[in-house]
Amino acid sequence: MQRGIVWVVDDDSSIRWVLERALAGAGLTCTTFENGNEVLAALASKTPDVLLSDIRMPGMDGLALLKQIKQRHPMLPVIIMTAHSDLDAAVSAYQQGAFDYLPKPFDIDEAVALVERAISHYQEQQQPRNIEVNGPTTDMIGEAPAMQDVFRIIGRLSRSSISVLINGESGTGKELVAHALHRHSPRAKAPFIALNMAAIPKDLIESELFGHEKGAFTGANTIRQGRFEQADGGTLFLDEIGDMPLDVQTRLLRVLADGQFYRVGGYAPVKVDVRIIAATHQNLERRVQEGKFREDLFHRLNVIRIHLPPLRERREDIPRLARHFLQVAARELGVEAKLLHPETETALTRLAWPGNVRQLENTCRWLTVMAAGQEVLIQDLPGELFEASTPDSPSHLPPDSWATLLAQWADRALRSGHQNLLSEAQPELERTLLTTALRHTQGHKQEAARLLGWGRNTLTRKLKELGME
């Protein structure tokens, strides 16, 4: 690849300085600008190979600049940078035709690699997308790298009606992602219909999906449209697809292949144009191996896969999510939003959250009603949060194991506002081990030291430190 010319526009001089030196170190020619008007003036006489632009700047913002650049130089790749890493920023950037989206703070080596990829793209004369989608905003929040990947995928799919499979534990927000995919798609003005396979009795699933004719079975007194007909032109979201019975999987596969189906008890084919988004918390590959899910249907659905991380893998998002849910709960209840004490925020980020984002949302709703003061303290948090297995604790251990008992003690201490837990617990732990080992060896110190994995001198020093001599 030929070395290229890079322009950087950002009102933050430190960002300009860092990028200019990093790009120059990679052998690229870099020119920096403080605002969008300077860039447009320079574009009148010359053009770079790639432009990096901040999204929020005084005067003309990055998206307005991007729009003008795409009108004048539609092939010029533009990378949008932002410290406000949310779904709307990502989708808006892609809608306006951005080459990519770079959330701050970014790894400088990754930024340089992205610039080089954009230059290669430009030099190969590939046309970037110019996406025009209008849709309502969503409540998706996430600055964690895994969530940024999700936002990118949604942005890149915003011109497409391709099938998507969403994987993630219960409570991670799979339906929210499905809504976002629909809202930021060409089908945004058409229906979005959701159906949970696990919530419907097996003998009613076919009727729910495909509808039925009058008299098709006992109680079918009228013709009824199924979910496919209701979603015609739009999106059908099939949640917990792994629970779909095999015979219904066969019918679904035929609909996906032919674009038509028969109502239960019907003889006339019904044609539909529906985008399928499926979701599951199960491992579908394993279900296929076990013969519980059709392999051909799996491949038909698994065109694009989105993995939603559990909350424990995106802990940096917990404070922002909690503040958001407290605001939402306050609006719902018509009260002033609660505030989180800094120690409470820290405690929330350390919890296990087996119910993921849904559990955090419900906790914030509970706090809005039950917390005594306007500021939420650690002791205000519901006890079951601490009684559940803590992050990194072996939840598979029996309830009377020492690790479980230690975790319960730590939970109680943290709820009471204790600090320096290690300095409090370590002497007691060592004293207990020493006492037990000496009792086991009938006071023989060298043998006790061997059992504990210490040298004789270490054991003697510990006895002195703990006042056990």
UniProtKB/Swiss-Prot annotation:
User: What domain of life?
Assistant: Bacteria
Give binding positions for ATP: 168-175, 231-240
Which residue positions does the secretion signal occupy? none
Q: According to its UniProt record, how is this protein modified after translation?
A: Phosphorylated and dephosphorylated by NtrB.
The record's GO molecular-function terms, alphabetically, read: ATP binding; ATP hydrolysis activity; cis-regulatory region sequence-specific DNA binding; DNA-binding transcription activator activity; phosphorelay response regulator activity
What residues are annotated to bind DNA?
445-464
Q: Where in the cell is it found?
A: Cytoplasm
Keywords of the record, alphabetical order, are: Activator, ATP-binding, Cytoplasm, DNA-binding, Nitrogen fixation, Nucleotide-binding, Phosphoprotein, Repressor, Transcription, Transcription regulation, Two-component regulatory system
Domain Sigma-54 factor interaction, which positions?
Answer: 140-369
Which ranges carry the Response regulatory domain?
Answer: 5-119
Q: Which InterPro entries match?
A: AAA+_ATPase, CheY-like_superfamily, Homeodomain-like_sf, HTH_Fis, P-loop_NTPase, Sig_transdc_resp-reg_receiver, Sigma_54_int, Sigma_54_int_dom_ATP-bd_1
Q: Would you kindly state one Gene Ontology biological process term found in this protein's UniProt entry? A: nitrogen fixation
Q: Matching Gene3D superfamilies, A to Z?
A: 1.10.8.60, 3.40.50.2300, Homeodomain-like, P-loop containing nucleotide triphosphate hydrolases
State a GO cellular component annotated for this protein: cytoplasm
Pfam families given in the database record: HTH_8, Response_reg, Sigma54_activat
Residues annotated with 4-aspartylphosphate modification:
54
Where the protein is mainly located, per its record? cytoplasm
Q: What does this protein do?
A: Member of the two-component regulatory system NtrB/NtrC, which controls expression of the nitrogen-regulated (ntr) genes in response to nitrogen limitation. Phosphorylated NtrC binds directly to DNA and stimulates the formation of open promoter-sigma54-RNA polymerase complexes.
Name of the protein in question: DNA-binding transcriptional regulator NtrC
